[in-house]
């Protein structure tokens, strides 16, 4: 059916056009004349019928009855050249209007999309004013540890003078108060740029570690960022103190073989020893393969020849999902016991603040500490912690360790359906975040009776064998405010969370808060595999690029990066044009902000790569690490040699290393028909300290 406007135009043209012609018995006459004749016959048909004799028909009784026979008229509309041209113009005009309407709708959609992008980049206005005349408070921010003040917004611990003065006027008003930076990080996911250099962070950490008292150092590394997460000056920073290395974020890595955790642990041992740390006595270092040599022919040339830092142990954990945390606590209580303070050290974004909060809720902190101490600020933005945060360590008396072991054995016999609905919901959420999930609990909690008489109670830790003063088991939390008294912290040893040390040549320093949230993986990584031929190019957002220049056969390229960071495949002749057109826009996603953002973003710098002796279609020969944005595991055909070219932004580092997950190419589905990509496959999450469903 024609649209109403078009039908109206055609009808008007029909009425204005020439008179239609009809054909009857081979004679052409106008429709108007035929209509008049028909009307005349209709008006006289009654009289004609009454004048016929009975039984006669209208045709049989009249010689001219043939003229009265019923016949069908078919109008024959004949258009002259002028009307035909008019109709074509009208159709052309209608088509133009439809095209204009489509362009208008598309323009409105683009405007709405730009408005949404602009809303995402909207800056929350920082209100308030500084007052340099007001002295610092002497009270630290409960989120980052910086001293609260209102003098300079660029100095850590700043609060607007209006809020600072009103809080000081109230008794205890600055207690548990967070600075403006922590507030914006938590509530608006925005980070204020502070005037704090890497040298200031190093000096703060070094000053804490130079204390003469015995101390244990927990050095946390990001497994996704090996080997760049190991600081080259770590031995000089730690000194002669004992050291335990914690490989964090193991929950984000998929299982490529059944023994992959043991292989990752051995790999971490090798990386730490290669960084200049002394292994413990009796440790046998695995033989290094040819593919593990640093590029450029140098073999740790910049590392100190002598080191006094002894590496006691290496452990894999997940501070977020709790995997390995209970085992870490048991190891610390058995080996270190209560001999001194413990310092948590590491680079930015390693997950130190997350582990601090997890241990605060565990048996490693005194029962009252979990009620009295606020949690550290957690954010993907580098350098969240700006000063030392601490909690008192629980003294592992024989009674406490006995009760703890009873709880761990009881927890290990429970099945998922035995847990409360709240615990089940928490575990289901953690399974979505990581492949390895563990339960972290508390053996003792602070009771209501103890809260009421806290000011008059002696410290339980100072009476190691006085079981009457032990915290009671499992009690509900109260909303009453709890404070640590001098008796609680008398002769106590502390667990310190130190500021993160900024890594040099890291791509995260070039990104905004929104871009960091996209690039840093927070959920279990799903590998994405592509089969590329020579002459093809792989883009990881607009942050990295790998050109496949030469090879005898196709090869597999497996991307291990944040699931939100897009991968785009194109040909070598189109790669430059595609980058110039789509960098900063939706297709490549990061950076965000269009041409204006890319104008200040460093250009990509190339570096040639040669990979020799492919091991076959089931084992990668090397990882190409694109700074901290992720890596690509390359799997050539057997004995094939590949010539590649990698790109990263200027000022960042591209690293070729032994494959961290050499068999990750096997974690894929079927190849997508007509595409170079394979369907993704997510391995199931593994639950520890919990029985399978009964």
From Swiss-Prot:
Database matches in CDD domains: YqeH
Topological relation to the membrane, as annotated: Peripheral membrane protein
InterPro entries: G_CP_dom (IPR030378), GTP-bd (IPR006073), Mito_transl_resp_regulator (IPR052807), NOA1/YqeH-like_C (IPR048422), P-loop_NTPase (IPR027417)
GO cellular component: mitochondrial inner membrane
UniProt keyword terms in alphabetical order: Apoptosis, GTP-binding, Membrane, Mitochondrion, Mitochondrion inner membrane, Nucleotide-binding, Phosphoprotein
Modified residues (Phosphotyrosine): 77
GO terms, molecular function: GTP binding
Coiled coil: none
Residues annotated as domain CP-type G: 202-504
Annotated compartments: Mitochondrion inner membrane
Pfam families the UniProt entry points to: MMR_HSR1 (PF01926), YqeH-like_C (PF21516)
Assembly and oligomerization: Homodimer or multimer. Interacts with mitochondrial complex I, DAP3, MRPL12 and MRPS27.
Protein name per Swiss-Prot or TrEMBL: Nitric oxide-associated protein 1
């Amino acid at each position: 059916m024609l649209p109403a406007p078009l039908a109206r135009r055609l009808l008007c043209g029909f009425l204005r056009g020439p008179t239609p012609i009809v054909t009857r018995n081979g004679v052409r006459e106008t429709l108007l004349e035929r209509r008049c004749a028909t009307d005349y016959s209709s008006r006289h048909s009654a009289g004609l019928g009454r004048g016929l004799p009975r039984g006669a028909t209208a045709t049989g009784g009249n010689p001219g009855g043939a003229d009265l026979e019923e016949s069908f008229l078919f109008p024959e509309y004949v258009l002259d050249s002028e009307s035909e041209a008019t109709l074509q113009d009208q159709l052309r005009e209608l088509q133009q209007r439809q095209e204009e309407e489509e362009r208008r709708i598309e323009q409105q959609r683009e405007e709405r999309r730009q408005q949404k992008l602009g809303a995402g980049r909207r800056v929350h206005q920082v209100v308030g004013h500084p007052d340099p005349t007001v002295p610092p408070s002497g009270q630290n921010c409960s989120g980052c540890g910086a001293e609260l003040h209102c003098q300079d917004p660029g100095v850590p611990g700043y609060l607007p003078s209006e809020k600072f003065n009103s809080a000081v006027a109230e008794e205890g008003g600055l207690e548990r108060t967070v600075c403006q930076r922590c507030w914006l990080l938590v509530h608006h996911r925005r980070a204020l740029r502070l005037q704090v250099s890497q040298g200031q962070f190093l000096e703060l950490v070094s000053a804490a570690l130079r204390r003469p008292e015995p101390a244990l150092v927990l050095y946390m590394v990001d497994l996704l960022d090996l080997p760049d997460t190991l600081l080259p000056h770590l031995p000089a920073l730690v000194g002669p103190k004992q050291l335990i290395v914690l490989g964090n974020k193991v929950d984000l890595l998929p299982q490529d073989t059944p023994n992959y955790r043991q292989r990752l642990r051995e790999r971490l041992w090798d990386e730490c020893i290669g960084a200049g740390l002394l292994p413990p006595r009796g440790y046998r270092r695995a033989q290094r393969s040819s593919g593990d040599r640093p590029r450029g022919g140098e073999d740790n040339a910049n590392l100190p020849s002598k080191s006094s830092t002894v590496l006691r142990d290496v452990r894999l954990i997940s501070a977020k999902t709790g995997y390995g945390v209970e085992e870490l606590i048991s190891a610390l209580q058995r080996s270190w016991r209560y001999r001194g303070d413990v310092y948590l050290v590491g680079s930015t974004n390693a997950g130190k603040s997350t582990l601090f909060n997890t241990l605060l809720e565990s048996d490693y902190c005194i029962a009252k500490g979990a009620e009295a101490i606020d949690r550290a600020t957690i954010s993907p933005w580098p350098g969240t912690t700006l000063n030392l945060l601490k909690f008192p360590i629980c003294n592992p008396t024989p009674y406490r360790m006995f009760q703890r072991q009873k709880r761990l054995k009881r927890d290990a016999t429970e099945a998922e359906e035995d847990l409360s609905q709240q615990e089940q919901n928490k575990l289901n959420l953690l399974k979505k975040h990581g492949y390895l999930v563990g339960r972290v609990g508390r053996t003792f909690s602070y009771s209501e009776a103890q809260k009421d008489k806290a000011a008059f109670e002696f410290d339980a830790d100072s009476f190691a064998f006085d079981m009457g003063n032990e915290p009671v088991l499992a009690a509900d939390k109260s909303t009453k405010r709890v404070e640590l008294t001098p008796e609680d912290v008398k002769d106590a040893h502390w667990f310190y969370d130190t500021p993160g040390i900024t890594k040099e040549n890291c791509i995260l320093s070039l990104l905004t808060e929104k871009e960091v949230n996209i690039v840093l993986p927070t959920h279990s990584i799903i590998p994405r595999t592509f089969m590329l031929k020579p002459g093809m190019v792989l883009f990881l957002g607009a942050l990295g690029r790998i050109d496949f220049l030469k090879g005898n056969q196709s090869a597999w390229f497996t991307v291990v990066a944040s699931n939100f960071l897009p991968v785009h495949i194109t040909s070598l002749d189109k790669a430059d044009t595609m980058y110039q057109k789509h960098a900063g826009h939706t297709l490549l996603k990061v950076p965000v902000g269009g041409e204006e953002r890319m104008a200040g973003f460093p250009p990509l710098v190339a570096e040639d790569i040669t990979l020799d002796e492919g091991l076959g279609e089931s084992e990668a020969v090397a990882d190409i690490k694109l700074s901290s944005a992720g890596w690509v595991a390359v799997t050539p055909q057997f004995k094939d040699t590949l010539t590649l070219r990698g790109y990263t932004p200027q000022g960042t580092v591209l690293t070729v290393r032994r494959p961290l997950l050499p068999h990750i190419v096997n974690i894929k589905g079927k190849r997508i028909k007509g595409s170079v990509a394979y369907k993704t496959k997510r391995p199931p999450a593994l639950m520890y300290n919990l029985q399978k469903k009964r």
